[in-house]
């Protein structure tokens, strides 16, 4: 990976965009969170608002019948000990290496907070709006100063991912 020096801040991140349908949206989010957890990646899940945050929190409690996925939110004690931390604010209390951004309404606004973004090694964006895909890629490329460094996946109707870029 290359380093890009911009405003004296080094960026070395892997960006991935996952596009899914509205019908599979929640299931896709839960599977990606589960994959982060089982890969031993501490993660921050950035939601659009407190309602989405609580919906994810509630669904993670009942998602897997096999094993509980430990997680917490800003309403829970000991955020530093949570492997999965769900929030609607730009926080990283668990020293996560992965940032999962769900349905970003303004990705440019999030990316502009460079001191926040630079601490993550991997940034995953999940969206159900196909028309935003090209716009997301342009904004990320502008942020990183690199082109074609973004992995893009789309989910087919049976739930598997196909790499599109």
From Swiss-Prot:
<dbReference type="GO" id="GO:0003677">
    <property type="term" value="F:DNA binding"/>
</dbReference>
<dbReference type="InterPro" id="IPR036768">
    <property type="entry name" value="PolIII_chi_sf"/>
</dbReference>
<dbReference type="InterPro" id="IPR007459">
    <property type="entry name" value="DNA_pol3_chi"/>
</dbReference>
<keyword id="KW-0235">DNA replication</keyword>
<dbReference type="GO" id="GO:0003887">
    <property type="term" value="F:DNA-directed DNA polymerase activity"/>
</dbReference>
<keyword id="KW-0239">DNA-directed DNA polymerase</keyword>
<keyword id="KW-0548">Nucleotidyltransferase</keyword>
<comment type="function">
    <text>Part of the beta sliding clamp loading complex, which hydrolyzes ATP to load the beta clamp onto primed DNA to form the DNA replication pre-initiation complex. DNA polymerase III is a complex, multichain enzyme responsible for most of the replicative synthesis in bacteria. This DNA polymerase also exhibits 3' to 5' exonuclease activity.</text>
</comment>
<comment type="subunit">
    <text>DNA polymerase III contains a core (composed of alpha, epsilon and theta chains) that associates with a tau subunit. This core dimerizes to form the POLIII' complex. PolIII' associates with the gamma complex (composed of gamma, delta, delta', psi and chi chains) and with the beta chain to form the complete DNA polymerase III complex. Interacts directly with the psi subunit (holD). The only subunit of the DNA polymerase III holoenzyme known to interact with single-stranded DNA binding protein (SSB).</text>
</comment>
<dbReference type="Pfam" id="PF04364">
    <property type="entry name" value="DNA_pol3_chi"/>
</dbReference>
<comment type="similarity">
    <text>Belongs to the DNA polymerase III chi/HolC chain family.</text>
</comment>
<dbReference type="GO" id="GO:0006260">
    <property type="term" value="P:DNA replication"/>
</dbReference>
<keyword id="KW-0808">Transferase</keyword>
<protein>
    <recommendedName>
        <fullName>Probable DNA polymerase III subunit chi</fullName>
        <ecNumber>2.7.7.7</ecNumber>
    </recommendedName>
</protein>
